[in-house]
Amino acid sequence: MNNLTPENIRQTILATPFLLNRIRTEFPQLAAVLNDPNAFATTWQSINASQLLQIPSSTYSMGMPSFSEDDLFDVEVQRRIEEQIRQNAVTENMQSAIENHPEVFGQVYMLFVNVEINGHKVKAFVDSGAQATILSADCAEKCGLTRLLDTRFQGVAKGVGMAKILGCVHSAPLKIGDLYLPCRFTVIEGRDVDMLLGLDMLRRYQACIDLENNVLRIHGKEIPFLGESEIPKLLANVEPSANAHGLGIEPASKASASSPNPQSGTRLGTKESVAPNNEGSSNPPSLVNPPTDPGLNSKIAQLVSMGFDPLEAAQALDAANGDLDVAASFLL
């Protein structure tokens, strides 16, 4: 960090929770002047900068006893030595990152755009990692879409947590910039995000997430991403997690067997693999009902030739009681 000015260092510390906590603990005199650029520069120059970056080697060697030659051949001792070497490597790697690439410890803000649904303004979370476009139950009600909710398409959205899928709105007008685009929404419980713009819509309209220019480009139109101050506060401080991958939807019956509370999750990314279940039926929904129509395979093949997913085609035919035209309208 020797090539950085005190002001750059101050901004990096303020934007990095790890460094900020450490400064407050180990260098309170520096933490006290973090909001005063001039006082910070003076205090910084009076402190050996290397102190801020160095983690004492004794941190990981404390509690490690000395070993005799005979002990060195012990499996448990070898394992402890290996773990100490690994921890030292991790520490060295982190010190190198802080010194050479401090920006990697900064905050990454989510991508949001302004949209309108039935004349109601909504901040949509752009997520190319989610297969389906999501609408919260509250937002669907505010936008007047609950009357179009098809409750046969129920299930559970799985991600970091789980959330109950209430159904689908097969087509509703979505305004993005100057464009009016028909959109299919999966409506779920939860209030973390009003709307999530998933890969189905992004691919359908050949959208381009242009991070260099900070815009979402659709059919030549550029929709700017919202600035940090405009992002909904609930997601402004979301940290990346390894558990945020592998998002999917399971039928409600399968999810309830693996979790006592399938409505407790909050992650909105989904993978559309839910089968519609008949309203009022006491049977739990299944992935695909057993085929009773001898021409079902040929109908699925026709829908697949139109560009639809085979599993979704089978589910739509099941919901439409085998009617090919109705099933196609579900998928549009």
Curated annotation (Swiss-Prot):
Active-site residues, as the UniProt record annotates them: D127
GO biological process: proteasome-mediated ubiquitin-dependent protein catabolic process; protein transport; regulation of exocytosis
MF annotations from Gene Ontology: aspartic-type endopeptidase activity; K48-linked polyubiquitin modification-dependent protein binding; polyubiquitin modification-dependent protein binding; SNARE binding; ubiquitin binding
Residue ranges constituting the UBA domain according to the UniProt record: 291-332
Keyword Transferase among UniProt keywords: no
Keyword Cell membrane on entry: yes
InterPro entries (alphabetical): Peptidase_aspartic_DDI1-type, Peptidase_aspartic_dom_sf, UBA, UBA-like_sf
Polar residues compositional bias, start-end: 275-286
Main localisation: cytoplasm
Assembly with partners or alone: Homodimer. Interacts (via UBA domain) with polyubiquitin (polyUb) chains (via Lys-48-linked polyUbs). Has weak binding affinity for monoubiquitin. According to another report, has no affinity for monoubiquitin.
Family: Belongs to the DDI1 family.
Function: Recognizes and binds polyubiquitin chains. Acts as a linker between the 19S proteasome and polyubiquitinated proteins via UBA domain interactions with ubiquitin for their subsequent degradation. Aspartic protease. Appears to act as negative regulator of constitutive exocytosis. May act at the level of secretory vesicle docking and fusion as a competitive inhibitor of SNARE assembly. Required for S-phase checkpoint control.
Protein's name according to its UniProt entry: UBA domain-containing protein Mud1
Gene (UniProt): mud1
